[in-house]
UniProtKB/Swiss-Prot annotation:
Propeptide stretch(es), residue numbers: 418-420
CDD domains named in the record: DnaJ, DnaJ_C, DnaJ_zf
Pfam families (alphabetical): DnaJ, DnaJ_C, DnaJ_CXXCXGXG
Alphabetical list of PROSITE patterns matching this protein: DNAJ_1 (PS00636), DNAJ_2 (PS50076), ZF_CR (PS51188)
Lipid modification (S-farnesyl cysteine), residues: 417
Cofactor(s) listed: Zn(2+)
Gene expressing this chain: ATJ3
Cross-referenced InterPro entries: DnaJ (IPR012724), DnaJ_C (IPR002939), DnaJ_domain (IPR001623), DnaJ_domain_CS (IPR018253), DNJA1/2-like (IPR044713), HSP40/DnaJ_pept-bd (IPR008971), HSP_DnaJ_Cys-rich_dom (IPR001305), HSP_DnaJ_Cys-rich_dom_sf (IPR036410)
Protein name: Chaperone protein dnaJ 3
Taxonomic lineage of the native organism: Eukaryota, Viridiplantae, Streptophyta, Embryophyta, Tracheophyta
Skewed-composition ranges (Basic and acidic residues): 377-390
Sites where the protein binds Zn(2+) 1: 148, 151, 207, 210
Amino acid sequence: MFGRGPSKKSDNTKFYEILGVPKSASPEDLKKAYKKAAIKNHPDKGGDPEKFKELAQAYEVLSDPEKREIYDQYGEDALKEGMGGGGGGHDPFDIFSSFFGGGPFGGNTSRQRRQRRGEDVVHPLKVSLEDVYLGTMKKLSLSRNALCSKCNGKGSKSGASLKCGGCQGSGMKVSIRQLGPGMIQQMQHACNECKGTGETINDRDRCPQCKGDKVIPEKKVLEVNVEKGMQHSQKITFEGQADEAPDTVTGDIVFVLQQKEHPKFKRKGEDLFVEHTLSLTEALCGFQFVLTHLDGRSLLIKSNPGEVVKPDSYKAISDEGMPIYQRPFMKGKLYIHFTVEFPDSLSPDQTKALEAVLPKPSTAQLSDMEIDECEETTLHDVNIEDEMRRKAQAQREAYDDDDEDDDHPGGAQRVQCAQQ
């Protein structure tokens, strides 16, 4: 991140005044002043939360030699421009705890009551349409980090740890470079000495089981209950089963259902759709067929006597759709979409037989004179989707050609003669 030192030096005394020390104060003087004022103004003892925050912000800047140098030279504005907050990016309770650990008041501090929450772990879970129709149980084996049982997540045999000297317990380091007059570059990164934990453990005191890492890998088997009627993208949550870490509220493991396509049935919410093709005879004279449902039942589907099924029509069967989630005895509808298959041609005898039983044409027969006055046409078969696709492609190509002509008006580019 880049920042430009202000041309007019801003206030560089405020942080010293907050701590009540002179600008020449030593690091030890800063520590003493902060500890005394922080205990007095701690919110758990009825102190002013804003004052407590200001003390932490001031001490965080002045206790860091590099930040203090920038503050003394350019003032608070330089830190704001370079770091986005005047050096107050850390929780004031973290800074306070680095002095007193669990707190000087014999109880939990406000910081301890607000433990950091670990990240949730999200896994996609593929399920079939049969799985969410019938319901199923899936056992899944997962790896996660668990607190070391030998040291209770302390990382050491004694349970003690030391504040990292490289980052003063903050877990972060700031690198600062001078790029030019009034230009500085500041970058914040995890401390490489403590890996961002703010603590170090004596090599001789390291836990023999976790080697000081505080956590160990473990295998965990979860039984995931996929209930009837669950939807695509619905979540199944196992609270507190994600990676464990010290002083952290464990996150959740979340499974997100990914419903696979079914070769026969299509699902839309609580309803199911299926395609069925009838011959022209079946559409006109009646039909019956067997449909195997998702649970293996055989459904007899048949038309009513004298019923004619039109092309592209739908029929519905109540209570044969999807079970409704958490109301498994209620179901949506099963819709059947009918397509009618017509013969490619008819013989003269077939045509006469059909004319004898089918309704007469709605349009009157044309006379020979009327036919003679008309222009004769020829019909040919066409795949309308392919036809439209070809037309769209031709239009795109023509549009591209127009763009090329606009780039080179008048056809080929002319070479300009140099003036004599």
